[in-house]
Amino acid sequence: MQPEGAEKGKSFKQRLVLKSSLAKETLSEFLGTFILIVLGCGCVAQAILSRGRFGGVITINVGFSMAVAMAIYVAGGVSGGHINPAVSLAMCLFGRMKWFKLPFYVGAQFLGAFVGAATVFGIYYDGLMSFAGGKLLIVGENATAHIFATYPAPYLSLANAFADQVVATMILLIIVFAIFDSRNLGAPRGLEPIAIGLLIIVIASSLGLNSGCAMNPARDLSPRLFTALAGWGFEVFRAGNNFWWIPVVGPLVGAVIGGLIYVLVIEIHHPEPDSVFKTEQSEDKPEKYELSVIM
């Protein structure tokens, strides 16, 4: 017989446990996206505020990519660790996730990114205030707005910027589909987040020059909104010839195109697995971690 205190503790724990699968998945997406932004934008903040002494392009590319991997490790077993509205949209379109979940996933992702940006702002508040004499600037050598959101290179047109985001996210989704395709080479179970992190390093290193390679509406729009409210002002939405919508719409289009390409060029041509193979797959890989459910 357990002590009375232990029984009370157990009852309290039981009261905390969520019964709704959707609620669990929503919280998972919130936490995963929060971690992505804190670690990812934290890498950018360290590089910018130290004026390159404690980071640069390499640390930002690697750090942000590993932030994605760590976020997927946190959320992957519960919600799949989409941490990206573009990914969630593609999964619904291609039957990997039910449509009614989409607004919950997307809302959690945007909220997690906003809270993550606020956390980075709080951690580096003194550094931000001393960096440009207390000014929060969007352009110039003392600009700090790009710690939180992406901005285009001076030469970049809106048409080129849109194509940039479509293509980058298209490639992201093609390879993510491949990583989780059990009938392709795939990745060893448990190493999928690392594979995705390496993928983002490659994309950021090859396609990041134009505008920073956001590929994620929540990662860009929520921190941008935070900066508008935190002191940079709503000029963050007008900067770059009203660039703000490009990292929102471009990834959504690119994700759909990328998923469609993989399905049409690779997935539908796989031979149907026999019943033994199906049984082995169901035993080796729980449904919650399959591409059809999480990615």
Swiss-Prot record:
It comes from the Eukaryota. It is a multi-pass membrane protein. Residues 80-92, 211-225 dip into the membrane without crossing it. Coiled coil: none annotated. Pfam families: MIP. The chain crosses the membrane at residues 25-43, 58-77, 99-123, 161-178, 191-207, 244-264. Residues 44-57, 124-160, 208-210, 226-243 are extracellular. It catalyses: glycerol(in) = glycerol(out); H2O(in) = H2O(out); urea(in) = urea(out); (S)-lactate(in) = (S)-lactate(out). Residues 1-24, 78-79, 93-98, 179-190, 265-295 are cytoplasmic. GO terms for biological process: amine transport; cellular response to cAMP; detoxification of arsenic-containing substance; glycerol transmembrane transport; purine nucleobase transport; pyrimidine nucleobase transport; urea transmembrane transport; water transport. A motif (NPA 2) lies at residues 216-218. It is found in: Cell membrane; Basolateral cell membrane. Gene3D superfamilies: Glycerol uptake facilitator protein. Aquaporins contain two tandem repeats each containing three membrane-spanning domains and a pore-forming loop with the signature motif Asn-Pro-Ala (NPA). Aquaglyceroporins form homotetrameric transmembrane channels, with each monomer independently mediating glycerol and water transport across the plasma membrane along their osmotic gradient. AQP9 is the primary route for glycerol uptake in hepatocytes, supporting hepatic gluconeogenesis. It exhibits broad specificity and may transport various small, non-charged solutes, including carbamides, polyols, purines, and pyrimidines. AQP9 may also facilitate hepatic urea extrusion. This is Aquaporin-9. The gene is AQP9.
